[in-house]
Swiss-Prot record:
Its main location: secreted. Its EC number is 3.2.1.171. It catalyses: Endohydrolysis of alpha-D-GalA-(1->2)-alpha-L-Rha glycosidic bond in the rhamnogalacturonan I backbone with initial inversion of anomeric configuration releasing oligosaccharides with beta-D-GalA at the reducing end. The gene is rhgA. It comes from Aspergillus niger (strain ATCC MYA-4892 / CBS 513.88 / FGSC A1513). The active site is at D216 (proton donor), H291. GO terms for cellular component: extracellular region. Coiled coil: none annotated. One of its GO terms (molecular function) is rhamnogalacturonan alpha-L-rhamnopyranosyl-(1->4)-alpha-D-galactopyranosyluronide lyase activity. SUPFAM superfamilies: Pectin lyase-like (SSF51126). Residues 1-18 form the signal peptide. This is Probable rhamnogalacturonase A.
Length: 446
């Protein structure tokens, strides 16, 4: 087998500024893993004929390399009829340079990586993909098919330079993971709820330079979570980024979202709950640009789309919304500021500053606050936290609301009844910024 054009990575995990608590990423490079052992799935029975099931070959390659090594999926088209549970890896990497097409019909997760450390999944060519063909389910009204990718209890990891398309259910879930980095990804799903882009909970995780198209979660933090940094995110006809849904014993702290661009989505950012308990604190949401979204800043502690949970409500405190620009679809119907907090667990120390948005339809917009205390717009600045409701109507556009768009903004969604094409990974995910890390394809050809 010819030598693999493996992306050169630093031996030490990366440390960045922000809400992270320490270094993130694999502890050893793909080069060192390959030098220990290389397991090509073709040697374990895989055939790039878009017919032969790759599931057993990938499982066997993992078993052979899980104690240290690199698993290689060469360019080509592979069918996946049986799902894989890849467990107990130590210093293991997977290079996906081919395209995996779902042919199986089981539920669960097509690819589950669990109880592993020092793990990396990426594509040398930045074109490796998994095509879930979710439309086969969705056109029948079925949203209970498999997820594409799930990491569970994985530490010191990276997932990058891969494309996930048309998941029957969620696209990518990180469940109780730590010290990880996710970047340079494109996720493209159907235009329906229940088809989440990225859901993450855990500790010390950096998600950046990701494009998501769907109609549910773009990049969403769930509980429990701490020290999560999310930046340079392109929600391109999506549900939008969010926190939640939040229920009993919520425990979220030290979260930073910045440089988030949202186009034709449900919201720019939503914190959603209905009853429940616990806390969300020390969160910053800054440098947001939006256009054509139904909601913009949306905190809803009585979110009717979830069943009410026992408890007085999730306590939100020390949350800052800063430097938001752009336009919303209809500011009279759904104003750009909505901070609706629980009467029995009011929000405290909320800050809204440098916020300038204007309606695309009509000539007025509203700001609504309920039981929310802090500084800015309709928030009440008071030592008292008794319940209140106020709505302000604005008929003059604020200065500085104008914001640029992205050239790749979609003009329509991909529906739910036809196959969705595999996109390429962009090199910019926020106006005026290039990706923090170059695509792997650029590094391997340099």
């Amino acid at each position: 087998m010819p030598a693999l054009p493996i992306l050169a990575l630093a031996l030490a995990p990366l440390l960045v500024n922000g809400q992270l608590s320490g270094s993130v990423g694999p502890l050893t490079s793909a080069h060192s893993k390959a030098a220990t052992k290389t397991c090509n799935v073709l040697d374990y029975g895989a055939v790039a004929d878009n017919s032969t099931d790759i599931g057993s070959a990938l499982s066997e390659a993992w078993d052979a390399c899980s104690d240290g090594g690199l698993i290689y999926i060469p360019p080509g088209d592979y069918a996946m009829d049986t799902w894989v549970s890849l467990s107990g890896g130590k210093a293991t990497a997977i290079i996906l340079d081919g395209t995996i097409y779902r042919t199986g019909t089981d539920g669960g997760n097509m690819i589950l990586v669990e109880n592993s450390s020092d793990f990396e999944l990426y594509s040398n060519s930045s074109s490796g993909a998994v095509q879930g063909f979710g439309y086969v389910y969705h056109r029948e009204g079925d949203l209970d098919g498999p997820r594409i990718l799930r990491l569970q209890d994985v530490s010191n990891f990276a997932v990058h330079d891969i494309i996930l398309v048309d998941a029957p259910a969620f696209h990518f879930v990180m469940d109780d993971c730590s010290d990880g980095e996710v970047y340079n990804m494109a996720i493209r799903g159907g235009n329906s709820g229940g088809l989440d882009g990225i859901d993450v909970w855990g500790s010390n995780i950096w998600v950046h330079d990701v494009e998501v198209t769907n109609k549910d979660e773009c990049v969403t933090v769930k509980s429990p979570a701490n020290n999560i940094l999310v930046e340079s995110i392109y929600c391109n006809w999506s549900g939008g980024c969010a926190m939640g849904s939040l229920g009993a014993d919520t425990d979220i702290t030290d979260i930073l979202y910045r440089n988030v661009y949202t186009w034709s989505s449900n919201q720019m950012y939503m914190i959603k709950s209905n009853g429940g308990s616990g806390t969300v604190n020390n969160t910053v949401l800054e440098n947001f640009i939006g256009h054509g979204n139904a909601y913009s800043l949306d905190v809803d502690s009585y979110w009717s789309s979830m069943t009410a949970v026992d408890g007085d409500g999730v306590q939100l405190s020390n949350i800052t919304f800063k430097n938001w620009k752009g336009t919303e679809a209809d500011g009279a119907e759904r104003g750009p500021i909505k901070v609706v907090c629980s009467d029995t667990a009011p929000c405290t120390d909320i800050t809204i500053e440098d916020f300038a948005m204007w309606t695309e339809s009509g000539d007025e917009q509203t700001y609504t606050c309920e039981s929310a205390y802090g500084d800015g717009f309709c928030l009440e600045d008071s030592d008292s936290t008794t319940s209140y409701t106020t709505t302000q109507t604005v008929t003059t556009a604020p200065s500085g609301y104008s914001a640029t768009t992205m050239a790749a903004d979609l003009t329509t969604d991909f529906g739910t009844t036809a196959s969705i094409p595999i996109p390429t990974i962009p090199t910019s995910f926020y106006p005026g910024l290039t990706a923090i890390s170059p695509l792997a394809s650029a590094a391997t050809t340099a």
